[in-house]
Amino acid sequence: MLFRSPTKTGAVEKDLPEIIEAVRESERLSLIGLMTLPPFFDDAEKARPFFRRLHEMRDEIRRQGRFGDGRGELSMGMTHDYVIAIEEGATILRVGTAIFGDREKP
């Protein structure tokens, strides 16, 4: 994670080398990319530094030859900030709200 959130969990940036090594040593896992969910901002432009940092991290891991497929996917960007994510190199988007509409609230 590139930031701490009480509502989200995941790997933190400092743990990435250890995680990459564990995946490399596994016979059943292959690292194919990185994903981030930045904080929600009314101004999507504020998500840019998070996307840019993940792109930088991906490029470094790719230079090291650590991605199983060699590419290193970047899963980042949702309905409200996907344009910024694309500009910062996203290869996978999560745009369910744009396709299916808002979720019903329980």
Model-derived regions: residue spans:
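Conserved alpha/beta-domain cores
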Residues: 1-80, 86-88, 100
